[in-house]
Amino acid sequence: MDNIDVIEELYNVILDRKENGKENSYTNYLFEKGIDKILKKVGEETTEVIVAAKNTNKDDLIAEVCDVIYHMVVLMVEKEVKLEDIKNELNKRRKKVGNKKPERRKIENI
């Protein structure tokens, strides 16, 4: 299995948990708790990526990025966003040329 397929497999497993459930499944637990719990986990894990990126341990960063991807896929399934939707959007974006956004004001100046 190549690396791209692992994300598709992850999506399919999470979708199956949503549709069929599985006893003692963390994924099932998230779906049972609902969107607020899922969003809380996405926020927590994203913060952990930021902290890990500031530190020097690459393995910690990799682990935290994987946690974010997992929780984002749970969110996608909860909101009925298909993996194909994401792939299509990414393909559209990579074809754009000259799409640099204007500089934003620094947060310190707000």
Swiss-Prot record:
Naming one, the record's GO cellular component terms include: cytoplasm
Looking up CDD domains in the UniProt record yields:
NTP-PPase_HisIE_like
Alphabetized SUPFAM superfamilies for the sequence: all-alpha NTP pyrophosphatases (SSF101386)
> Which Pfam families would you find in this protein's record?
PRA-PH
Annotated compartments: Cytoplasm
InterPro entries for this protein:
HisE (IPR008179), PRib-ATP_PPHydrolase-like (IPR021130)
State the reactions this protein catalyses.
1-(5-phospho-beta-D-ribosyl)-ATP + H2O = 1-(5-phospho-beta-D-ribosyl)-5'-AMP + diphosphate + H(+)
Q: Which ranges does the record mark as transmembrane?
A: none
- Biological processes per GO annotation: L-histidine biosynthetic process
Q: What is its EC number?
A: 3.6.1.31
Q: In which pathway does it act?
A: Amino-acid biosynthesis; L-histidine biosynthesis; L-histidine from 5-phospho-alpha-D-ribose 1-diphosphate: step 2/9
The record's keywords, sorted A to Z, are: Amino-acid biosynthesis, ATP-binding, Cytoplasm, Histidine biosynthesis, Hydrolase, Nucleotide-binding
MF terms in GO? ATP binding; phosphoribosyl-ATP diphosphatase activity
Q: What is its main location?
A: cytoplasm
Report the sequence similarity comment from the record: Belongs to the PRA-PH family.
Q: What is this protein called?
A: Phosphoribosyl-ATP pyrophosphatase
Source taxonomy lineage? Bacteria, Bacillati, Bacillota, Clostridia, Eubacteriales
Its gene name is hisE
